[in-house]
From Swiss-Prot:
Residues 209-223 are annotated as: Fe-S binding site B. [2Fe-2S] cluster binds at C172, C181, C184, C186. It comes from the Eukaryota. Its cofactor is [2Fe-2S] cluster; [4Fe-4S] cluster. The lineage of its organism: Eukaryota, Metazoa, Ecdysozoa, Arthropoda, Hexapoda. Residues 4-129 are annotated as: N-terminal SAM-like domain. Keywords: 2Fe-2S, 4Fe-4S, Cytoplasm, Iron, Iron-sulfur, Metal-binding, Mitochondrion. It comes from Drosophila yakuba (Fruit fly). Pfam families: Anamorsin_N (PF20922), CIAPIN1 (PF05093). InterPro entries: Anamorsin (IPR007785), Anamorsin_N_metazoan (IPR049011), CIAPIN1 (IPR046408), SAM-dependent_MTases_sf (IPR029063). This is Anamorsin homolog. GO terms for biological process: iron-sulfur cluster assembly. GO terms for cellular component: mitochondrial intermembrane space. The keyword Isomerase does not apply.
Amino acid sequence: MENFKGLQKSLYIWTDSADLDKRVQQLKSATGGDVALENVHRLSFSSYANSSFDLIVIECAQLTDSYVKLLHMLKPSGKLHLVSFIGPAASLLQEIKLSGFINCREDSPDALTAEKPGYETGSSARLSFAKKNASAVNVWKISGDDEELIDEEELLDEEDKQKPDPAGLRVCSTTGKRKACKNCSCGLAEELETEKQSQKANETAKSSCGNCYLGDAFRCSTCPYLGMPAFKPGEKVQLGDNLLKSDI
């Protein structure tokens, strides 16, 4: 009872009326406050308001359906003290915890104490994690001072830096494109034709399938070069007279 000093309002729930006055006086002396009385069998019919008592003392622990009610009757951080309980203390402590009490402990072989949390049952509190910290650094934002810029000159190789031949940039005075018009009189048509003929002369000779010079392993079944050794691309190969005659 020494831990209950200073509690102003207490409720004593009794089962045996013998020496009841003596026990009540002991509780008053320990707390220094007022003590109300209630019979354990009348507890379910009582209509105490929520948060009415700082301390509730019970002589009997056979209240499996009343611990939640006692929790509501206590003020925040109020205490529940059980004496002369029946059954194992561990089982009773677990039952009290499941009813919402905290700091449940066994004071002695025949006494238990528990506390109501320091807030009212059903109360709520605003959570602070939704608040934005104005000074917080947005790590996803990239600072311009930390950017590594690519040197534009490194994107160009030596060929890109060479100036084009002005002769190859000549365009038709009529169309504005490097394509001669129908009645070209500026000389672009002749120039393009010369380039075309020069390109044809430099092209590598190719067969229809492009594999004749590689050898029989790459030639088609009707190739006239079947049976002949491989030759270099563009090399002149003379076919026999028998290959130039029709089989029919």
